[in-house]
From Swiss-Prot:
Signal peptide annotation: 1-21
Native organism: Drosophila melanogaster (Fruit fly)
A single GO BP: canonical Wnt signaling pathway
Post-translational modification: Palmitoleoylated by porcupine. The lipid group functions as a sorting signal, targeting the ligand to polarized vesicles that transport Wnt4 to unique sites at the cell surface. Depalmitoleoylated by notum, leading to inhibit Wnt signaling pathway.
Family in the record: Belongs to the Wnt family.
Glycosylation sites: 74, 284, 419
Compositionally biased tracts (Basic residues): 449-460
UniProt name for this protein: Protein Wnt-4
Location of the region described as Disordered in the Swiss-Prot/TrEMBL record: 34-77, 436-463
Keywords tagged on the record: Developmental protein, Disulfide bond, Extracellular matrix, Glycoprotein, Lipoprotein, Secreted, Signal, Wnt signaling pathway
Record's compositionally biased regions (Low complexity): 51-74, 439-448
Major location (coarse): secreted
Taxonomic classification: Eukaryota, Metazoa, Ecdysozoa, Arthropoda, Hexapoda
SS bond list: 274-285, 322-330, 332-349, 397-411, 399-406, 478-497, 486-492, 496-538, 512-529, 514-526, 521-522
Protein's job: Binds as a ligand to a family of frizzled seven-transmembrane receptors and acts through a cascade of genes on the nucleus. Acts downstream of homeotic complex genes in the visceral mesoderm and is required for embryonic segmentation. Also required for cell movement and FAK regulation during ovarian morphogenesis.
Length: 539
């Protein structure tokens, strides 16, 4: 076993091969002095060695990017161990994650714990020369050519956005925000690989976000899907086509060929009705609050609303698609049976609300479980959206008889227009309740109700999913109201946050003085009139 003052050799994995996770190793030797320091006796030699390391690292970066762009690379974990295992390369199965990294640099001595990349140290003044160079103890130091501390602030540190293009994920509470990242949940932008613990994974899939399961907090699937609904535009790669999806969601889209188109319809319903409901409010369904912060950073009242609206739109679209024959694994809803007192016959094709609820809960992963407070509230708010669709079910009837009489009537169950559901959820948004952190979780409330002794039900039980909950007070959204149109001057006073507004006079041309031609039915003739209209815009 080498002593602390011995010679350290760092083996760097330089080439990730195609195929089934096979790796070709190309070793690089970094010369170290007897005391563990870089040999700096000859400055010219030291400078030449440093340039060689830089050129070699650039070659590695170019080769990795080339392989990742092909989209065929297996997810392989890059890893270097310390101590007795210094200089070794440890491989794991594709997507196996970074749990193989069993030590982080924590030395506080003047000697770097690892020289030439690998794991750095907070307490020492050295930068890692080559490699990822992840510092220990909370990202204390940057690295020279790799993932540096403080979001790569070192002049030679690669930007996080660049690493995102390599498909690197930092999961959960250990994560850092990236191009599409939020709340330290994920760092994404290119191919996606597996990750575990505090490790880094390099992925192979550059066409869609086919993510490893279990790498994020419980509420991530729902949060990711809702965010995709309000940010995705056009088609994306993957079986779900119209929105980035997890591996399990992509599997659902493969099994049900009608689901991708139905999800696209749900996205259209959610975004258009959200914008209509908040057209003249400071928040107009934009995910941004100010700068690059978005409403998914914390659980605001707006976050609760978009989760409820997305779940409602998915339930509505799937239930309607079943009844219209656009789904392969469902059809009309269950038939109703007539009672003696009814003066009509149940018939027609009911909207399949039951199937819509089931698929929505599965796609958003709303299954029960012991989750954290945010998970439980997001799950509850999504259920509020599903319940809103259920409450808008109505009877649709058609009369049959001679000469338009209604001697016989056939009825079926049909959902109301989605505008009614969106209006109901907007009302629930206005009445939403902020939940104090020390209150019981939603699951505890549900469990306490379930423990009550069973009683014979005399009337339909009232749903518990009637109120939206949130945790954080919403920001002002004043930073995103510039140039927004107001409804009237009084509305500008609120919408423009006191910055004032400008008035534009717009000429409108519209039909007027309409009449029947020569007094006969039914040819209508109209004149065209000009009308001046004031429009108001925030400064």
């Amino acid at each position: 076993m080498p002593s602390p003052t011995g010679v350290f050799v760092l083996m760097i994995l330089t080439h990730l091969s195609f195929g089934l996770g096979q790796v070709r190793n190309e070793d690089q030797l970094l010369m170290v002095g007897q005391n563990g320091d870089l040999d700096s006796s000859n400055p010219a030699i030291h400078h030449q060695q440093h340039q060689q390391h830089q050129q070699h690292q650039q070659h590695q970066q170019h080769q990795s990017n080339h392989n990742l762009n092909n989209g065929n690379m297996n997810s392989t974990i890059l890893n270097t161990l310390m101590g007795n295992n210094a200089g070794q390369v440890v491989n794991s199965s594709p997507g196996g994650g970074g749990s193989m990294i069993n030590q982080l640099g924590s030395s506080t001595s003047s000697v770097p714990s690892v020289i030439g990349g690998g794991v750095g140290s907070v307490g020492n003044p050295w930068h890692s020369a080559v490699g990822l160079g992840v510092p220990g103890n909370g990202m204390g130091l940057p690295s020279s050519h790799g993932l540096g501390g403080n979001m790569g602030s070192h002049p030679h540190g690669h930007a996080l956005a660049g690493l995102a293009k390599l498909g690197i994920i930092v999961p959960g509470g250990q994560g850092l925000p990236g191009n599409l990242g939020y709340g330290g949940t994920m760092l994404n932008g290119g191919g996606v690989g597996g990750a575990a613990g505090m490790g880094l994974g390099i992925g192979s899939n550059t066409n869609n976000m086919d993510m490893q399961q279990g790498l994020y907090n419980e509420h991530f699937i729902s949060e990711h899907t809702v965010m995709a609904v309000f940010t995705s535009q056009g088609q994306v790669g993957g079986p779900c086509r119209y929105m980035p999806a997890t591996r399990r969601q992509n599997h659902q889209c493969r099994k049900e060929t009608g689901l991708p188109g139905t999800l696209s319809e749900a996205r259209r319903l959610a975004t258009t009705h959200c914008e209509e409901q908040f057209r003249y409010d400071r928040w107009n369904c934009s995910i941004e609050t100010r700068g690059k912060r978005n409403i998914f950073k914390k659980l605001y009242k707006e976050t609760a609303f978009v989760h409820a609206l997305t779940a409602a739109a998915m339930t509505h679209s799937i239930a309607r698609a079943c009844a219209e024959g656009r789904m392969t694994k469902c059809s009309c809803g269950p038939k109703k049976h007539n009672r003696e007192a009814q003066d009509f016959q149940w018939g027609g094709c009911n909207d399949n609300l039951k199937h819509g609820k089931r698929v929505t809960r599965s796609f958003l992963d709303l299954r029960g479980g012991d989750g954290d407070e945010v998970s439980e509230i997001l799950r509850h708010d999504s259920e509020v959206g599903i319940e809103a669709v259920s409450s808008q079910m109505m009877d649709k009837c058609k009369c049959h008889g001679v000469s338009g009489s209604c001697s016989m009537k056939t009825c079926w169950k049909k959902m109301a227009d989605f505008n009614a559901t969106a209006t109901l959820l907007r009302q629930k948004y206005n009445e939403a309740i902020r939940k104090a952190p020390n209150q019981r979780s939603m699951r505890q409330v549900s469990s306490s109700r379930m423990k009550k002794p069973k009683q014979r039900r005399k009337k339909p039980q009232q749903s518990q999913y009637t109120t939206l909950y949130y945790l954080e007070t919403s920001p002002s959204y004043c930073a995103v109201t510039k140039d927004r149109q107001c409804l009237h001057p009084d509305n500008c006073g609120t919408l423009c946050c006191g910055r004032g507004y400008t008035t534009q006079v717009v000429k409108q041309v519209e039909k007027c003085r309409c009449r029947f031609n020569n007094g006969r039915c039914c040819q209508l003739i109209c004149d065209y009139c000009q009308r001046l209209e004031n429009k108001y815009f925030c400064k």
